[in-house]
Amino acid sequence: MNLTRRDLAVVGVFALSATPLIVPAMAGTDDEEAVKQAVEALRKAILAQDKATLETLAAEQLSYSHSDAHLEDKTKFINAIMTRRAVFKSLEFPELTIAIAGNNAIVRHLWVSESELDGKVTNTKIGVLQVWQKQGSSWKLLARASFKLPESA
């Protein structure tokens, strides 16, 4: 098969015109993976009481609410983790979904944990909504709200 300059020009024009359609889709996939990694880093940092990682992942404007409506800013959130008396035996974030919306990501998952305080084991299963924001090249946790699940969940 012989390709002419005209054939190559047509292919080139097509390739260049398709780039704006392909690149955002690929960027979304890269961003989803980066957010997924940030969520996993947050889970591990909560378990390990890793203050440096928590400081890095949380946005300065963080609004963190618990299922009992208790609200914390970045400082209170990190201090609560660092001074907690309960020991997490496990913490998982199953049913993770991520939706990229510009420089924001909407993350939903369950919070499934087992913790122990004064010899008493507590199992927790709640729903969580997180909003992550891309600040520079990093994803930061901007907001988090948790909620009680229906009895059947």
Where are each of the predicted segments found?
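A beta-strand edge to alpha-helix "cap/lid" segment located at domain peripheries
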Residues: 9-17, 24-56, 63-153
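Positively charged n-region of N-terminal signal peptides that target proteins for export
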Residues: 1-6
